[in-house]
Amino acid sequence: MTGILWEPIFVLIPSDPPTAPRWLDVVNISRNSAELKWTVPERDGGSPITNYVVEKRDVRRKGWQTVDTTVKELKYTVTPLNEGSLYVFRVAAENAVGVGPFCELEDSVLAKDTFSELEKNLGGL
């Protein structure tokens, strides 16, 4: 095999941001907080997911407010909320390439306690 030159071949595997998280839901709401949960994106884009970005928006406003960009779990409690305001939430996954598309709640939720103090007291009868 003399006279044959071997050269290394480099293969680049393209990576993309992850797809949107799935099944975003508000599992608990109070007058000043909302507990969110979601499931992992269908695809990580070829690079492990490093964290999630959580945003909120008061429906009376146009712009989104970033709540946290370093969420590591598949749940997060958003605080503070203004009692009596309607909110929508969204979550995006991030990997080494960047932030993917957001998964957004379809319906707004009202920031209020689930049970009033009177209802709590009557429940003990």
Name each region found by the language model.
Residues 1-125:
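Extracellular low-complexity, O-glycosylation-prone stalks/linkers
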